[in-house]
Amino acid sequence: MMRLRTLLQPWLDLTDADDRPVGGLAVDSRDIEPGFVFVALRGSRHHGLGYLGDALAAGAGAVLWEPAGDVAPEPDERTAAERAGVPLIAVPDLGRRLGPIAARLYGDPSARMRVVGVTGTDGKTSVTQYLAQLLDREAHRCGLVGTLGSGFPDSLQPGTHTTPDAASVQRTLARLHRQGAAQVAMEVSSHALDQHRVAGVRFHTAVLTNLGRDHLDYHGDLAGYAEAKSRLFGVPGLQWAVLNLDDAFGRQVHGALAGGTRALGYSLAGHPQAGVRGEGLVLEPQGLRLRLSTEWGEAPVQAPLLGAFNAANVLAVAAAALSLGVALPVIVERLAGLRPVPGRMEPFTRPGRPSVIVDYAHTPAALRGALAAVRAHYRGAVWLVFGCGGDRDRGKRPLMGEAAAELADRVVLTDDNPRREDPDRIIDDIRQGAPGRDWPVLRDRAGAIRHAVERAGPEDVVLVAGKGHETVQQIGDRCLPFSDREAVVQALGEEEGA
């Protein structure tokens, strides 16, 4: 077991009195086990020192804390720590240093695997899931880290963040390596990049899906959001950058890549610099087909996925697999066997009833893409059930209302994690993008889904957008159990979706 003095030697020179074995690192006091080191970071609203008492009670063997203004351990906490023999060690710039510290503790696991990081406004979850499905084989396993959890495609442990904290990232990578992973597909959010959660991860390939409007409540503006995303493509040692050249930001990153990183662009629009192109896209009820043209050859591709945006995701997956050395014929064969990702354009059907699609679309671009997809794949009227999250970017709400007015035939407005915000104000913001539309409002989300499913015809399609895989509805400070997927199954009157 590594000792604390050895662990921190590149950054701090500890005294013998502070030295002790390190059982693990934890940012969340609830994850502390006896002998773990509690890491107290400064946050945008709170400092981890607020949970110092909980960490000491759980058996923390030492505490690393990040200086921030006048924030410091309270006198009574210092006394309690001293009595327990627990050193409180101030580490300047700990937020930036935690990733490399954790990597050192857990044996630098990403150096022993090939890690693919996927970032972008929309498509991160789908691309990582599809890539892991394509790569994962019994003798050559591919791990997953992302919104749906961590593990392997057939066995995920639920998580709380798209990208976990820096200590958890390294601990998870070490676990996946022990379990046989030779490669890992990881979602990398803008928050994670801004907060240095993937510092210390040695990425082999970085993928950009697109850049649209999201998380402006955190980043302030689109420029700040873009700057955070771009950091993934400047990490030391990055070998490949897989970039969507149909996206303006993708082209910008392509032109700014540092030497030593090879660019592999992909395009559905025939961009001349794209090494992976999709041509002749056809959308059918059972999925999509196109011709894949690459620097490694050409081949027809079929995939059981819905939407032109999923065609772009297929290109991203193919390009990432090519960057890892997977042969084109193998890629084509495995794309045909992809399984839908829970809550990502996931179809539910029952004979004689409308088709229902559950999708996570919660940005204007994603909602437009999902609506365009169901319009292309189905012949009947397009129904839409959606709302917008509370205490988040208000500016996107009228844009989503505008998308609904343009692309849906029938719309039912409902709640989608209103949190502490007045749900009526959220609905009013959405309506600003669709003046004159008298859409029904059913605040109860299950009731709204049932309303649409009961009124839609058997040739129609109902898109339930916004929550996807989520299993709670956030109302006020409460997280109440709720699943769009389960509500759809109940509305269709069957036990499971197709």
Swiss-Prot record:
Family named by the database record: Belongs to the MurCDEF family. MurE subfamily.
Organism: Alkalilimnicola ehrlichii (strain ATCC BAA-1101 / DSM 17681 / MLHE-1)
Keywords noted in UniProt: ATP-binding, Cell cycle, Cell division, Cell shape, Cell wall biogenesis/degradation, Cytoplasm, Ligase, Magnesium, Nucleotide-binding, Peptidoglycan synthesis
Annotated meso-2,6-diaminopimelate binding sites: R392, D416, N417, P418, R419, G466, E470
One annotated Gene Ontology cellular component of this protein: cytoplasm
Post-translational modification: Carboxylation is probably crucial for Mg(2+) binding and, consequently, for the gamma-phosphate positioning of ATP.
Keyword Nucleotide-binding: yes
UniProt-listed Enzyme Commission number(s): 6.3.2.13
Residue numbers carrying N6-carboxylysine: K229
Pfam families associated with the record: Mur_ligase, Mur_ligase_C, Mur_ligase_M
One of the record's GO molecular function terms: ATP binding
Cofactor(s) it depends on: Mg(2+)
Binding locations of UDP-N-acetyl-alpha-D-muramoyl-L-alanyl-D-glutamate: S29, T162, T163, S189, Q195, R197
A GO BP annotation: cell division
Binding site residues for ATP: G120, T121, D122, G123, K124, T125, S126
Gene: murE
Motif interval(s): Meso-diaminopimelate recognition motif: 416-419
Name listed for the protein in its UniProt record: UDP-N-acetylmuramoyl-L-alanyl-D-glutamate--2,6-diaminopimelate ligase
Lineage: Bacteria, Pseudomonadati, Pseudomonadota, Gammaproteobacteria, Chromatiales
Subcellular location: Cytoplasm
